Amino acid sequence: MSSLPKYQEIYRRFRQAIDQGQLRPGERVPSVRALAQELKVARGTVETAYQLLVSEGFFEARGQAGTVIAEALPPMSVKPTPVALPGTSGPRPLQMGLPALDAFPRKLWARLVTQQVRRTDADSLAMGDVRGTQALRVAIASYLALYRGVECSPQQVFVCAGYAGCLTLVCDALAMAGQRCWFEDPGYLHARQLLEHHGVELVPVPVDRDGLDVEQGMAREREARLAIVTPAHQSPLGVALSPARRQALLEWARAQGSWVVEDDYDSEFRYRGQPLAALKSQDVDDRVIYAGSFSKMLFPGLRLGYLVVPVSLVEVFERGAHALQQRSAQMLQLTAADFLEQGHFTRHLKKMRQLYAQRRGYLVEALRVHCAAFLRVDEQAGGINLLARLVVDVPDRAVAEAADRAGLAVQALSSWTLEVGRGQGLMMGFTNVATAQQAKDLALVLRSVLAECAGLSTR
């Protein structure tokens, strides 16, 4: 049984038959309906395969005369554009939250790892400090002071196993089980799931064009113990927390004795305007716990996140870290420290900003050309994902499920909401859309899915 999505299996069968001369220019191919019935698959599945073949010049659609093999075929040396990567550990098409894995400097990273291996001594083979290696904590503190305006000592930095490890440590150190927490609505799905797993009572706070609505938060639960926010680039709407609301949030935390977790999500990837200052850089009363992660900037398998905690919380977080014993591999931490200290990290981010702006443009243009009847892409100043609003009356979860069956890893906006009525849309990643042709192919697949869900035909 092939692990390929069915539409791609049909596509490849036709390509093979054309390349081997079994199907010749001008020959008719079965209608979408006939082939779907013969193969016992949905019409949209066959339609998607046919659209890809038309887009690459192998089929010609002749209206009522049907579809035929193109008279002027592309050369055989032109390989089919990969639309999906099934059966591998690589990214799925349009998968969110991933950096461009093809652009990571693997040779440089391997050299740094090798250097660390050569320096291995007895101490580096031990369990290590539960707060993280001193070298990485120093490097993080230095980077944050220089590039995010966050002044802290290495003693305030706690290295965790990814962002999930950061939230786990926060929940444990602050004894959040049964406590109330402001949570952006819509907000980061995996964070919501993890907080609920730890028994945190989430208070949904609406997000609008100015970010988290602090007045709504105070009206709903003024005495919440914690607020979790993404002020630089809200996840998933992409808006920034306005200066007035930043100040209101900090004043609320000071007045109530509450804490704010700043998830500095995607702040490094901004494509227009100046980078926004971290909320922590404005935190004169020391009520903000700053959270960052290397997973979306380097590679997800690194599983390295970090917290910068207020001075008053260092001891309680140390106790929490000792209780949890969630260490990341020392070798990876030391390699990451070298990557930061030697300037490779900032050079990599600069390169990725340029690359992501280009790849974002590929996908936005492809969606505009091929999916405008179904979607409207939100304008966002940065980030590594797109949000496209549905302009047809189709449930976004139904579209996401159908897209998943077609091999696309899009997500429904409504899945990221706590309260109903927050909008319908599709979220998708663009960082691994390497070419304009690949973006076009993906948009055609998505268009077919949308048309099928809307009960329309794209032929």
Each language-model region and where it sits:
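N-terminal basic, amphipathic alpha-helical segments
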Residues: 1-116, 120, 125-129, 136-138, ...
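Short, conserved active-site loop motifs that form the nucleotide-linked donor/cofactor pocket
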Residues: 157, 258, 288, 375, ...
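Conserved core of the PLP fold type I
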Residues: 113, 118, 123-256, 268-269, ...
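Active-site PLP attachment segment
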Residues: 64, 281-316, 328-331
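Short glycine-rich anion-binding loops that position phosphate/pyrophosphate groups of nucleotides
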Residues: 99, 231-235, 296, 433
